Amino acid sequence: MSFKSIFLTGGVVSSLGKGLTAASLALLLERQDLKVAMLKLDPYLNVDPGTMNPYEHGEVYVTDDGVETDLDLGHYHRFSSVQLSKYSTATSGQIYTKVLTKERNGEFLGSTVQVIPHVTNEIINVIQSCADHHKPDILIVEIGGTIGDIESLPFLEAVRQFRCEHPQDCLSIHMTYVPYLRAAKEIKTKPTQHSVQNLRSIGISPDVILCRSEAPLSTEVKRKISLFCNVPEHAVFNAIDLERSIYEMPLLLAKENISDFLLNKLGFSPKPLDLSDWQDLVEALCDKERQHVRIGLVGKYLEHEDAYKSVFESLFHASVPANCSLELVPIAPESEDLLEQLSQCDGCLIPGGFGTRSWEGKISAARYCRERNIPCFGICLGMQALVVEYARNVLDKPLANSMEINPETPDPVVCMMEGQDSVVKGGTMRLGAYPCRIAPGSLASAAYKTDLVQERHRHRYEVNPSYIERLEEHGLKIAGVCPLGELCEIVEIPNHRWMLGVQFHPEFLSKLAKPHPLFIEFIRAAKAYSLEKANHEHR
């Protein structure tokens, strides 16, 4: 086999941070001059997370080739340089759909279709296809869910078979939780022991046990885990809870020397690991002595932080080159004191979303920021809110609206794109990377410093082309359009401190090591506004 595989499973509890761990391992392995590919296997029966409730699943991360994926792929992108595509994700829904389609087409020649071998073979095909497409030195496969979940069993069986076929080229990491009982003042290893026993009963003996814990594990505890879980003591690693930032995870794992162990186990020769640049970025990100800037997020799903995970992280990324310390202030659009809360912020971000709830609150926020010259950034639905607000209060079209909100509006400033009126909702939006031509002399041009960019999209609605001329006549600047059909991509208000809306999702391209330019300029504008307010108060 031309590549090596690392399989990452989780036990004891969910939300252990397997995605962050996988992303951090990718960073460490890339620093060893190895090409890494990543694959997330999700046990749920949905074909993809595109139609799932954000409260249940978190954000939907979109790849360049237009695949709606799990938010863990966002972690992979933000930490590493891996190329993500449709080959980087698979769900039980996709696997079973493929199997049943083959059955209907007669490809199984009348055989009784079963989980073993048909479903497991399809899972193995997914693993192999990811490697064939990305051609990595090492493929990291994260298996969603928790050991013991019935949904994960076909994936684990497929991994067992794959390991049997390629015993020298595969490695299994099992991540567990080691609780600390405060009353007894003891660290308990029994849940980890049972989780490993469960995994071994399926036929997978882990090569590495990575223990998540509140505090560092003693040598005695590691020795006990080693003894009862049948792994060498030097294969028991510790991932303590991070106190400052998730971006400390690669530094923590590097300190544990886990990458050297993995490379030796897989037949590679480890090189000295230099993470000084990453350490500097983390220290800058966590520096609370920098100027304090408050950003209000006026969003629909703020009760669940993961619903806007990429937006939150992109703002923090931008705070490093902007040299400020960010405080993110969640503001419910339905709040009675919405405007009062905004008045205490240095900038406002209106993220994407769907549906009528909270729409008018977003429009109120956009108007407040426009009239009071407060930096404001609208993304996807947020941009549409900026445009509708402008049409209502500057074009004097009080009934202007989006057709998503009111299909009968007399002034449909935002309309459904041609060909988007499909009854089937899953995977039918305008998805993936499209080009955007930037207008010279615009805020967007100052940020990008180029006239053509590629950005990722996820939407059905657009600014109505029949209203663009009137919007421009009344001062709204169309600062970016898609050359493939002249679709409006970026709007700005020229005589404003910084007010910009984008139809795409710039948060899907931001990394700690390479923040997105629009987020940087937004945070810089908010910082300047904060300084201006402070100077005015001290006069």
UniProtKB/Swiss-Prot annotation:
SUPFAM superfamilies to which the protein is assigned, alphabetical: Class I glutamine amidotransferase-like, P-loop containing nucleoside triphosphate hydrolases
GO biological process, one term: 'de novo' CTP biosynthetic process
Binding site residues for ATP: 15-20, 72
Pathway linked to the protein: Pyrimidine metabolism; CTP biosynthesis via de novo pathway; CTP from UDP: step 2/2
Annotated L-glutamine binding sites: 55, 353, 381-384, 404, 460
Regulation of its function: Allosterically activated by GTP, when glutamine is the substrate; GTP has no effect on the reaction when ammonia is the substrate. The allosteric effector GTP functions by stabilizing the protein conformation that binds the tetrahedral intermediate(s) formed during glutamine hydrolysis. Inhibited by the product CTP, via allosteric rather than competitive inhibition.
Keywords for this protein: ATP-binding, Glutamine amidotransferase, Ligase, Magnesium, Metal-binding, Nucleotide-binding, Pyrimidine biosynthesis
Any single Gene Ontology cellular-component annotation: cytosol
Disulfide partners: none
Reactions the enzyme catalyzes: UTP + L-glutamine + ATP + H2O = CTP + L-glutamate + ADP + phosphate + 2 H(+); L-glutamine + H2O = L-glutamate + NH4(+); UTP + NH4(+) + ATP = CTP + ADP + phosphate + 2 H(+)
Domain of life: Bacteria
Stretches assigned to the Glutamine amidotransferase type-1 domain: 294-532
EC number, UniProt record: 6.3.4.2
Pfam families, per database record: CTP_synth_N, GATase
Name of the molecule in the record: CTP synthase
Source organism (scientific name): Chlamydia trachomatis serovar A (strain ATCC VR-571B / DSM 19440 / HAR-13)
Gene from which this protein is expressed: pyrG
